[in-house]
């Protein structure tokens, strides 16, 4: 054979061998992938759920991207029961007993993939994102007095001042009459009220959103944009990149930013730094309580920031939901109005123009309290999955009287909306807004203040508002109403 021919054939033979090995490698990797998928599927095959949930988490990611997780969870729960698989390694429950077991039994840890994605700062945790159980519980004890009000005696007064600003804003700019109908976005006004209230409660001074009748510093928009970006990062699975040393700083907000959430951070941090630099400051607010209980330095900055962020957003869905269902339900509206009028008539609450009802007085109005509870059931402020990781070795939970084994490492989350609308717990009319199911006292007075002074009517009953779910928090907007003075 010609030697030249052998020299020419050698590279070709080498390429053939390389191609065959590459093909074997591809087949091997594909086989390992299939085996791994089958193993993951088999771990939770005893738990009902959509077939695809055992192999892919993309439907779950899609629901997060569409800000529609709660409706998606509810649909799965309706079909597969109170314990259902929603992703290869994630199960969702609507059982209060199972969720109480998961959150109270030692060994369960908050899932890093979810809670770390909710960090506001680069590689820094707060009480909301801390997954170390001991650190989380310790920080909660430090913050509790300032959050509950026991360490912040001026909390009610601070909220009342903002409530008076809200009433003044409505009366001075948005009062409709027979001659003119003036639409008002109630959800946005409530947002201004919340932002001013939480800043007054936390930092001792309202930000002035109600006085300016606007998002004067862009804080609301920047917070909402941050929540949307966080949801997108979590859904697409790249939120971990925000926590990478050095590089992650480029992807997260910073107090050095001139716009967006970083601007909100800078304002909050400046207030905290000013307080820390003046230890003799005798103001009584949540931040002062935090500092008195040992939360200082960067920790004080982080906790004040999350307290401001969550406090300005979380209650909005419940408050808007309560008012929406009262305004759109003539029977509930009339009963609540009658109770409030009777209380004012008998001296159990101040009459219109004679000041604000106190928290203690509001707790003595049973139908008001039932309405608030029903609103919280219908529109829970926080609806995220908030998963816990099953401890090593696994655990057994009881679902509707039957034991169900959960392998170690599996994530267990909850669907609050579906849980609060279970017909076996709340009755066959669980999807209806009916305060009579409660009649138990609870805190709250904003609905009382608004309903005692004004009459409301929805501008568009067919589409009364817009909502979207971001990181388990409902963002509510475009709740247009007409407000008239009560005669």
What are these regions (language model features)?
Residues 219-293:
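Cytochrome P450 catalytic core segment centered on helix I
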């Amino acid at each position: 054979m010609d030697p030249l021919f052998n020299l020419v054939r050698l590279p070709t033979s080498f390429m053939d061998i390389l191609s065959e090995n590459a093909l074997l490698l591809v087949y091997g990797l594909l086989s390992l992938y299939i085996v791994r998928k089958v193993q993951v599927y088999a771990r939770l095959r005893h738990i009902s759920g959509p077939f695809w949930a055992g192999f892919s988490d993309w439907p779950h990611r899609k629901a997060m991207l569409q800000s529609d997780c709660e409706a998606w969870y509810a649909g799965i729960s309706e079909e597969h029961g109170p314990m259902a698989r929603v992703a290869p390694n994630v199960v969702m429950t609507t059982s209060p007993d199972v969720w109480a077991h998961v959150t109270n039994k030692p060994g369960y840890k908050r899932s890093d993939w979810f809670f770390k994605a909710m960090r506001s700062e680069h590689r820094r945790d707060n009480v909301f994102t801390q997954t170390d159980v001991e650190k989380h519980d310790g920080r909660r004890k430090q913050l509790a007095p300032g959050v509950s009000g026991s360490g912040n005696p001026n909390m009610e007064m601070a909220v009342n001042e903002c409530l008076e600003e809200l009433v003044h804003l409505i009366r001075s700019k948005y009062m409709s009459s027979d001659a003119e109908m003036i639409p008002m976005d109630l959800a946005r006004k409530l947002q201004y009220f919340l932002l001013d209230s939480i800043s007054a409660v936390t930092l001792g001074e309202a930000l002035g959103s109600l006085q300016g009748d606007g998002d004067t510093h862009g804080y609301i928009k920047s917070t909402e944009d941050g929540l949307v970006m966080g949801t997108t990062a979590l859904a697409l699975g790249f939120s971990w990149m925000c926590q990478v040393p050095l590089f992650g700083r480029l992807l997260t907000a910073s107090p050095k930013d001139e716009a967006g959430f970083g601007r909100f951070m800078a304002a909050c941090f400046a207030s905290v730094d000013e307080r820390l630099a003046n230890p003799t400051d005798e103001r009584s607010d949540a931040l002062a309580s935090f500092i008195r209980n040992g939360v200082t330095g960067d920790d004080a900055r982080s906790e004040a920031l999350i307290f401001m962020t969550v406090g300005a957003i979380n209650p909005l869905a419940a408050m808007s939901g309560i008012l929406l269902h009262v305004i759109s339900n003539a029977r509930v509206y009339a009963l609540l109005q009658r109770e409030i009028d009777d209380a004012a008539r008998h001296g159990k609450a101040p009459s219109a123009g004679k000041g604000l009802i106190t928290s203690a007085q509001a707790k003595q109005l049973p139908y008001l309290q039932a309405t608030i509870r029903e609103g919280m059931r219908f529109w829970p402020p926080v609806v995220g999955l908030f998963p816990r990781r099953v401890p090593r070795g696994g655990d057994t939970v009881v679902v509707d009287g039957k034991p169900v084994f959960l392998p170690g490492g599996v994530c267990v989350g909850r669907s609050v909306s579906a849980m609060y609308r279970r017909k076996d717990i709340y009755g066959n009319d669980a999807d209806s807004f009916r305060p009579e199911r409660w009649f138990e006292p609870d805190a709250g007075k904003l609905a009382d203040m608004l309903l005692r002074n004004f009459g409301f009517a929805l501008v568009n009953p067919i589409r009364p508002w817009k909502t979207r779910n971001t990181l388990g928090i409902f963002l509510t907007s475009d709740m247009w109403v007409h407000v008239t003075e009560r005669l």
